[in-house]
């Protein structure tokens, strides 16, 4: 709440905030569901539900001061599930579907494009990306993990069913990701 108020109180064009999917969807309760949940540990630490709601309200309001910032953290399982585990949540495979979920839930899908694709480059004075994506409303299951030569990475919402897949349309090709 305080961070949202601070960003909103500053002169437009000088201060903005990137917002992660985890801070839009999770509160501190998910850290301790039954026992410590290391794959939900991140920095800044998740706050109370009232804070999450304030962030959702700010992000879906259409304000140009807030934009996508996945802050993906692909730490290997063994570096998360240990006494001094790394902070961060790996959300790259699910980020766009999760942002779409939040915007749809509050009836603000018309503001999703600006949040994900326009506000950031405009704030930094960068050119806007000319590639296009299309979200397709379909159910898919998030993989339990992704295996790499260096170890397994557990994604945000591993094993859960999400609604939305991504069709990426570039100038040269079409790429479908059902994740």
Model-derived segments and their meaning:
Residues 1, 127, 132:
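Metal-cofactor-binding active-site regions of metalloenzymes
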Residues 1-68:
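Histidine/acidic residue-rich metal-binding segments in metalloenzymes
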Residues 4-7, 27, 123-125, 142-145:
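Short, solvent-exposed polar/charged micro-motifs at secondary-structure junctions
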Residues 22, 73-75, 140:
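Short, glycine-/Ser/Thr-/acidic-enriched flexible segments
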Residues 41-46, 74, 143, 155:
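Proline-rich low-complexity regions
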Residues 61-128:
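His/Asp/Glu-enriched, well-ordered alpha-helical/loop segment
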Residues 130-178:
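C-terminal cap of metal-dependent C-N hydrolases
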């Amino acid at each position: 709440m305080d961070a949202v108020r601070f960003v909103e109180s500053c002169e437009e064009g000088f201060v903005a905030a990137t917002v992660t999917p985890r801070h839009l969807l999770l509160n501190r309760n998910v850290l301790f569901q039954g026992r410590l949940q290391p794959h939900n540990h991140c920095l800044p630490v998740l706050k109370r539900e009232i804070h999450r709601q304030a962030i959702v309200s700010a992000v879906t309001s259409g304000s140009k001061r807030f934009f996508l910032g996945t802050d993906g953290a692909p730490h290997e399982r063994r570096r998360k599930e240990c006494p001094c585990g790394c902070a961060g949540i790996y959300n790259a495979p699910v980020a766009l579907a999760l942002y779409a979920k939040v915007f749809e839930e509050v009836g603000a899908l018309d503001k999703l494009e600006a949040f994900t694709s326009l506000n950031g480059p405009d704030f930094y004075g960068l050119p806007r990306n000319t590639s296009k994506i299309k979200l397709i409303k379909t159910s898919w299951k998030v993989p339990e993990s992704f295996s790499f030569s260096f170890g397994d990475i557990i994604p945000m919402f591993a094993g859960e069913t999400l609604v939305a897949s991504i069709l990426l349309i570039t100038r040269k090709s079409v790429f479908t990701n059902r994740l």
